[in-house]
Amino acid sequence: MHIKKGDNVKVIAGKDKGKEGKVIATLPKKDRVVVEGVNIMKKHQKPTQLNPEGGILETEAAIHVSNVQLLDPKTNEPTRVGYKFVDGKKVRIAKKSGEEIKSNN
């Protein structure tokens, strides 16, 4: 998967199209990512010992990785991801600017 935790992405399809956020978690087996502030779902929580009031909580739900695009670190525009070997290590590069993408976990 070309998106990693800590990456800044833009949603390119779906109900939250146009929103930007940071990737909180990746789910590689399901090809999904959880993005901060995107795809907010309401979860009805029963009262428990930890949360005696219960109520309705809002949390981010996962969206398919094909619906997000990585933001170029140089221009802050959506870009595709390429790979290049630098000093024997495989690194991700932004296709638009050629800039190396560093994951900031």
Curated annotation (Swiss-Prot):
Keyword Ribosomal protein: yes
Gene Ontology terms, MF aspect: rRNA binding; structural constituent of ribosome
Disulfide-bonded cysteines: none
Gene3D superfamilies xrefs: 2.30.30.30
Keywords (A to Z) from UniProt: Ribonucleoprotein, Ribosomal protein, RNA-binding, rRNA-binding
Pfam families: KOW (PF00467), ribosomal_L24 (PF17136)
CC per GO annotation: cytosolic large ribosomal subunit
GO biological process: one example: translation
Role, per record: One of two assembly initiator proteins, it binds directly to the 5'-end of the 23S rRNA, where it nucleates assembly of the 50S subunit. One of the proteins that surrounds the polypeptide exit tunnel on the outside of the subunit.
Protein family (similarity comment): Belongs to the universal ribosomal protein uL24 family.
Subunit structure: Part of the 50S ribosomal subunit.
UniProt-recorded name of the protein: Large ribosomal subunit protein uL24
Gene it is expressed from: rplX
